[in-house]
Each structure stands twice: as C-alpha cells, then as structure tokens.
C-alpha cells in the first residue's frame, strides 16, 4: 500500500506540464463527476484486519443508578459497529494536473453524536447548589429551628486611622456650622452698643441681605475722606457725570475713538469750585475715565475727588449712584447727571439734564451756572426742597424768570423808598420844580445792586484772580507733578526690591559724588 502511494505521488510530480490547448472551449469535453474514477484515482482498499475503535464508555458515579449509565452507554454506541470505514471519493477536475492528487475531506460515518450534557461529571448535586446559594427569609431555618449565619449584619472593618480621620472630618464640619451661626448672630449686634437690632429672624434676614449686598454695594463703605476744616471745606458737594455732561465720545473707522470737551467746561468748573466741592462721579470704569479727567483738570484744582464705576452700586441690574456712601450730609449734596437711573435711590438730590450730543455751539452747561451759584450764595439749610420745586422743568429758563421777578420787585421797593433820586436828561432846576419820573427801564447811577448781583460780581473777581494765578505758575505746578510721579515710581521700585530682599538705595553717596 505504501509502495502504491509513493509511485502515485512520484508519477504526478514528474509528469510534464500539459501545453495550452488552442481548441475552442465549446469543443472541450469535460468528464462528468458522476462517472466512476479511474483505477489510479481510487483509494486503496482497507485491510480486513483493521477493527473499528471501541465506543466511549464514561464512568458512572456511585450516586447515579445503573439505568442512567445504561442509557448513556446505549446513546453513545454507533448505529452499525460492523460497517467498515470507507474513505471519501476524491474530486476530479480536468485541466489541472495538481487537482488529481488532492482529495476531498473524509466523510463522517453515520454515527449518532453522543450528548455530552448528560455526563455525570457535569451533574451538580442539589446539596451543593443549596450551599452555594444561601436561602433568605423562612428558607434560612433548618432542622431544630435554628437559623444559618449569612454574615449580612456583620460590620465593615475600619482601621484606627480611618476612624480618626472620619472623627476629625465630622468635628471640622461641626465647627464650621457653629462658626457660621455665630457669625450671623454677631453681625446682628450694633458695633457701638453691642445690642441686637431686632429679633433673631429679623437679624438673620438683615445679615443675609447684607451678605448678598456685598456684591452690589460700592467697593468701600466711605467713598470720600472726612471734610476739611471750615475755612477750607466748601459748604456743598456737587457730583457731576463725565460722559454726556462734560465730554462726548464718538467712534468712526477713520479716526477711531475721539473725545470732545463740551463748551464752557473750564469756566463751569473754575467758577463753581468757589461754592461747591466738585466730585467727578462717573459710571465709567477707571481705566477709561481717568485719562479724560486728567486732561480736563490736570492739577486737580477744581475736581479734587474722582469716583468711577467701582464706587457705584447695582440695584435690580441697573447702575445707581448712592450718595449715602459719600460721607457727606445728604441735605448738602447735588447730583448733576444725564441718566435718571443713576439717581433712582435719591431722586430728590438729582438734577437730570439732556446729554450733550457733541454740537459745538452748546450752552446748556453754562446756563446752569446762575441757578447753582444762587444756592451757594444764599446758603440754604437743605437743597432738596429747592430741587424738588424745579423738578420736571427747564431749570435755566425757570430760574431766569424767578431772578428777573425778584430784581424787578427790589427795584420797585427802592424807588418807592427814594422817589426824588432821579438823574439823567431833564434833571435839573425844572425837574426839581415840576417833578419828573424816570422812564421805564432807565437806569439810575445811584441805584444799589441786589445782594445776588453783589456776590456774583465778587465771585467773578475771585475767578479771574485764580485763573491768573494758575496761568502764571503753570510751569511750577507741572514740575511739581513730574517730581511727584518720579518719587512715586522710585518708591515703587524700592518696595519691589525690598520685597525681593535687596537693600534699599541710599541717596547720600550720590550727593557726595556730585559735590566732589
């Protein structure tokens, strides 16, 4: 048999390659696979002394009965034990010499496959299943009325370090809660007397509102320093806005941002600074409004204090200027603004004007000077009733009418008291004999000025003297300002070097070198 297989293998190896056929495919006859193979293609016969393999006989456990083993053995026996094993017929393909040597896979005998799921080794004992799955409830009871211990109620093991850590965490949370409650209660006490302002609920509510107002109130509780002594402190405080009142900013593609100063700003600030402590109270941020304020008042002679967006507060999402943080008497404060929302908290202290749109011939700011100077001249105890009387009106026009009426009344009273004091054309011997009355509107040289006119003339002279003084000493003030900037810069550098640990710079050796 080995010899036949070897000869068949060698014959297929040394066989010459079949040349390509030029015959048309339609004339090529392909042998049918249903016909019997040639003797060379037939497999060798199986010897008669070859016996089939013994059937699989699994071992049966002692717990199972003989009937179950018999059923398993009967299921695993083949259908016909005496049938010889026949190899499969090879597949013949003409046209390829190598395909003749290849054989198809052997066909399985017609034997029923055994059912391995019924093996005794895969059978699970019911007692083992009961042990692996503990029962719950009533199933935990066993013989004798006892219950099995499942370990469900056993506590988790915690180390001493973990217990200590948890204890300190609980203590920290407790201390934080006690401190929060104590802080809320302490904030309800008066700082001077130490007494509570109200009940616990009212105190807690006020403290919580104050806590949330921290983000809405100004950055400082006191926006202005304490007033100066009487000779130097002005009796009234005038808070003025920047954008729309003193300047107007516009933007275009050609020039970018440009800021124009309103006509009469210098005269407005220089003249009213005699009667008012002028405070620039702008709703713009510091980095945008401060450079403009420096251009308007470089010496800080007329606007000594400047407040910006950080000094305002937010009420219902709106920017509001609260004068209660100014450290000044509200009855002596006037807020001049162009936005009604800015004076929403104290409307009785505000004067709302139309914003300036940048027109060059505007006189709205100068027209407000007579009204404001009259308050400084007559020195009322409270400015709020006066402002309320002009609320909703055109203040320059209404005040001009009031002033004209007051002057006419004063002249009439003076003429009634001095009927013979007549001068001018026709005044002489005949006038003294027949009498004469001055024409309406004619002026008399000896007619006295009103109190307002006298104070106004005096204020004008003071304003002119101040302007002359600032113009003559402008270079000196610029030099002082520059020296102050250099001094601040040197202090800043020294503080940084001192923070880093470097020694401070001494000016002594430098002076000695210069003298030498």
Swiss-Prot record:
PROSITE patterns: FCP1
Gene Ontology cellular-component annotations: TIM23 mitochondrial import inner membrane translocase complex
Low complexity bias spans: 64-81
Bilayer disposition of the protein: Single-pass membrane protein
Superkingdom of origin: Eukaryota
Any one GO biological process: protein import into mitochondrial matrix
Annotated region (Disordered), positions in chain: 1-119, 131-161
Polar residues bias spans: 1-25, 96-107
Sequence ranges on the Mitochondrial intermembrane membrane side: 188-516
Topology feature Mitochondrial matrix, residues: 18-166
UniProt KW keywords: Membrane, Mitochondrion, Mitochondrion inner membrane, Protein transport, Transit peptide, Translocation, Transmembrane, Transmembrane helix, Transport
Transmembrane segments: 167-187
Disulfide bonds: none
Domain FCP1 homology: 231-375
Role according to the record: Essential component of the TIM23 complex, a complex that mediates the translocation of transit peptide-containing proteins across the mitochondrial inner membrane. Required to direct preproteins in transit and direct them to the channel protein TIM23, and possibly facilitates transfer of the translocating proteins from the TOM complex to the TIM23 complex.
Name this polypeptide is given: Mitochondrial import inner membrane translocase subunit TIM50
Biological source species: Cryptococcus neoformans var. neoformans serotype D (strain JEC21 / ATCC MYA-565)
